[in-house]
């Protein structure tokens, strides 16, 4: 299956279809969409975003705690879409503040 992903970036919204077995960051990059990242392994906060709608599987991540996940934080480098999703990107400063 694939789902509609909407990324709300500082440059405006970007929408694309993303297969449910491809990380959101990886697919965005293939489409030329610029999202920050560093480790690509779910163990830092560079790619952090805020889930506005929908759900993701980010079970490979090791950085966020349960409370942050409940608040809607998502690491796009290890997040698979599990429904149509809307994510605000470029949120690392807010997460680590």
UniProtKB/Swiss-Prot annotation:
Localization (cell): Plastid, Chloroplast
Cofactor note: Binds 1 [2Fe-2S] cluster.
Lineage: Eukaryota, Viridiplantae, Streptophyta, Embryophyta, Tracheophyta
Function noted in UniProt: Ferredoxins are iron-sulfur proteins that transfer electrons in a wide variety of metabolic reactions.
Organism: Sambucus nigra (European elder)
CDD domains documented for this protein: fer2 (cd00207)
Highest taxon of the lineage: Eukaryota
Stated family: Belongs to the 2Fe2S plant-type ferredoxin family.
Residues engaged in binding [2Fe-2S] cluster: 39, 44, 47, 77
Annotated Gene Ontology cellular component terms: chloroplast stroma
Keyword Chloroplast: yes
Primary location recorded for the protein, binned into one broad class: plastid
All residue ranges annotated as the 2Fe-2S ferredoxin-type domain in the record: 3-93
Gene3D superfamilies in UniProt: 3.10.20.30
Name of the protein in its database record: Ferredoxin
UniProt keyword Iron-sulfur present: yes
Cofactor section: [2Fe-2S] cluster
InterPro entries: 2Fe-2S_ferredoxin-like_sf (IPR036010), 2Fe-2S_ferredoxin-type (IPR001041), 2Fe2S_fd_BS (IPR006058), Beta-grasp_dom_sf (IPR012675), Fd_pln (IPR010241)
Biological-process GO terms, alphabetical: electron transport chain; ferredoxin metabolic process
UniProt entry keywords in alphabetical sequence: 2Fe-2S, Chloroplast, Electron transport, Iron, Iron-sulfur, Metal-binding, Plastid, Transport
GO molecular function annotations of the record: 2 iron, 2 sulfur cluster binding; electron transfer activity; metal ion binding
Pfam families (UniProt xref): Fer2
């Amino acid at each position: 299956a694939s789902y509609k992903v909407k990324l709300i970036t500082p440059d405006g919204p970007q929408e694309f279809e993303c297969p449910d077995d491809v990380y959101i960051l990886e697919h965005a990059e293939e489409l030329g969409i610029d999202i920050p990242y560093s480790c690509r392994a779910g163990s830092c906060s560079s790619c952090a975003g805020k889930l506005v709608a929908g759900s993701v599987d980010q079970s490979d991540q090791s950085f966020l705690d349960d409370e942050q996940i409940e608040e809607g934080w998502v690491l796009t480098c290890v997040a698979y879409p599990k429904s149509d999703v809307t994510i605000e990107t470029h949120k690392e400063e807010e997460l680590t503040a």
